[in-house]
Amino acid sequence: NEEALFQQMLIYERKGLYYPPHIHANRSETHIVLKGSLELFILDNHGAVLETHINCDNDSNITTVSSPIPHLTRPISDFVIYLEIKNGPHKPFASDCFIPRPFGMETFNERQYNDYLDEFSIL
């Protein structure tokens, strides 16, 4: 139910695909990895990396991103399955996304931004 005040989504993401940076207004988000490994990047308002966190199926890490912190997730393993929990009602993902321009740079395309994120990867 998209109007429910408690939202749980089982998410499947594949390595190598682009998952854009986004900001949730008035919503926090929690990630619990069930299979695979997931990177979480905490960003500034322009998309520059401030922090990196790793969640794996073999650890007990759970990450929560408070509102309105810019962030993105990226699979480390070939694929990742994770439970995402957030307060509702549900809002379409695309409406929360933004185009990254770290340090005032020109707009990155998806590949360039993923290359930029690689510089901060913990693994």
Language model segments and positions:
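Short loop/turn positions at the edges of beta-strands in beta-sheet-rich folds
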Residues: K15, A25, L34, S67, ...
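Cyclic nucleotide-binding regulatory domains
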Residues: E39-T63
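Short beta-strand His + acidic residue motifs that chelate non-heme Fe in jelly-roll/DSBH
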Residues: P20-H22, L40-I42, T63-V65, H71-I76, ...
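Tight coil/turn sites that cap or link beta-strands
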Residues: E13-L17, D59, S66-P68
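Double-stranded beta-helix
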Residues: H46-H53, L72-L123
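Glycine- and acidic-residue-biased ligand/ion/polar-headgroup-sensing regions
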Residues: N26-H46
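A short glycine-rich, His/Asp/Glu-containing loop-to-beta-strand
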Residues: N1-P21, R27
